[in-house]
Amino acid sequence: MEYFKNVPQIKYEGPKSNNPYAFKFYNPDEIIDGKPLKEHLRFSVAYWHTFTANGTDPFGAPTMQRPWDHFTDPMDIAKARVEAAFELFEKLDVPFFCFHDRDIAPEGETLRETNKNLDTIVAMIKDYLKTSKTKVLWGTANLFSNPRFVHGAATSCNADVFAYAAAQVKKALEITKELGGQNYVFWGGREGYETLLNTDMELELDNLARFLHMAVEYAQEIGFEGQFLIEPKPKEPTKHQYDFDAASVHAFLKKYDLDKYFKLNIEANHATLAGHDFQHELRYARINNMLGSIDANMGDMLLGWDTDQYPTDIRMTTLAMYEVIKMGGFNKGGLNFDAKVRRASFEPEDLFLGHIAGMDAFAKGFKVAYKLVKDGVFDRFIEERYKSYREGIGAEIVSGKANFKTLEEYALNNPKIENKSGKQELLESILNQYLFSE
C-alpha cells in the first residue's frame, strides 16, 4: 500500500525551483571538503512527531489526517506506521530515523505483553532495514507518558517505578542494538521536581546516577557499542528538570564518574527554554568534548514552551553547523528533526514539506558555515582579541607562572589599561555578508 500517493520522490532542483516537493539547497551528493553533503549532515526523521503526533493540544482535539487512521487495532496501526515510515524515508532519502519504544509499538496490559508487541514490530522494522538505505540513528525509552511516571522514573520516590523503568530501558537497549542503532538517548522529562517541599533531591540525583551506571553496565554486557547521549532540557513537563542545560548535565556526569560514557544530544528549543542561544549549548558541549548529536528544531521566541518547529532560521542553522564543523563533524551523531508540523498543517503532505524546509535550511547553513570556517573570519578576530595572553603577563597567567603577588606588582606598575572595541556590529555585518552572498 502506498500511503503518500500525492508525494513524489523528493529530489534536488536548486534555489530557483518553484516545486514544493523539491530541495532548493540540499543536494545530498554534493561534495564538500571531500565527502557528500548527506554524510556531513546525517539527517534523521523523528518517529514520534512524524507518525504518532495527532495534533492534540490542551485546548483541542486531534486534527491530523493520516492514511492509517482507518485502523482501530493498536497493533494494526503500529504496523501501518512502519509501512508509511519507510515510504517517507525513501521519498525523502534520509539516512536515519530515531524512535522511542512506545512510538513504534503500543503498550499492553502488562510489561510482558508490551515487550511482545515490541518484538513483533521490531521484527517488521528489521525486515525493512535489510533493503532500506535508512538506518537507526538512536533509540530511547519513553519514561514520561504513562501515569506510573508521575513522580519520575529513575528519580521516582517509588522504588517499584525505578524497577519498572530499569526493565523498560533494558528492553529499549536490546532493541536499539538489534536494529543497529548508533546511539542511545536519555531524556529526563519527569526527572525533576514540582516543589522541594516533598523532594529528597540528594537521593533522587544519586538514584539517577545509579540508574545510568546500571545502563552502562548492561550495554557493555550485551555488547552495545553505540554512544550514550543525554538530552538537556530545563523544564516541561516538569517544573525543574535535573538535566537543565549542557553545563548542568556535564557537572552531574563529572560528579558521578559518568562523563567517560556519555555525550550530549543538544536540542535548539531546549536551549532557548534554558535561556541560552542554541549556539551557546553547542559551544559549551563542543569545547568540553561532549557534543554527540543534535535535535534539530526551533522555538517561537514569543512563547514560553517547547514548540518544536521545523528549523527554518538560516542564521541559527549556520551558527549551529559552525560548531559542528569546528569539532570535526559528527561521529555517530546527526541532525534529528525533533520537529512537528503545526496543528493547522494537518494534511499528510505537510510532513514532507516540513522536512524539506528543515533539510534545506541546514544544508544552506552548512555551506555558509563551511565558508566562515575556511576563511577564518571569526578565528582571526578572536585570535587578535586575546593576543595579550600569548605574550608578557598574559602568557605567564596562561602558563601558570603568575600568582596574586606577581599580578599585583604588575598592576601597580601598569596604571594605564587600554581596552579595544569588541566590534560586535562589524562581526554581525560580516556574518550577514556570508549569509546573503549566494
From Swiss-Prot:
GO function terms (MF aspect): magnesium ion binding; xylose isomerase activity
Gene3D superfamilies: Divalent-metal-dependent TIM barrel enzymes
Active-site residues annotated for this sequence: 100, 103
Keywords noted in UniProt: Carbohydrate metabolism, Cytoplasm, Isomerase, Magnesium, Metal-binding, Xylose metabolism
One record GO biological process: D-xylose metabolic process
Binding site for Mg(2+) 1: 231, 267, 295, 338
Enzyme class per UniProt: isomerase
Cofactor binding: number and manner: Binds 2 magnesium ions per subunit.
PROSITE patterns in the cross-refs: XYLOSE_ISOMERASE
InterPro entries: Xyl_isomerase-like_sf, Xyl_isomerase-like_TIM-brl, Xylose_isom_bac, Xylose_isomerase
Cofactor list: Mg(2+)
Localization, UniProt: Cytoplasm
Family annotation (Pfam families): AP_endonuc_2
EC nos: 5.3.1.5
Reaction equations catalysed: alpha-D-xylose = alpha-D-xylulofuranose
Highest taxon of source: Bacteria
GO-annotated cellular components: cytoplasm
Keyword Chaperone (UniProt): no
Binding site for Mg(2+) 2: 267, 270, 306, 308
UniProt subunit comment: Homotetramer.
Family according to the record: Belongs to the xylose isomerase family.
Protein name as it appears in the record: Xylose isomerase
Organism: Thermoanaerobacter pseudethanolicus (strain ATCC 33223 / 39E) (Clostridium thermohydrosulfuricum)
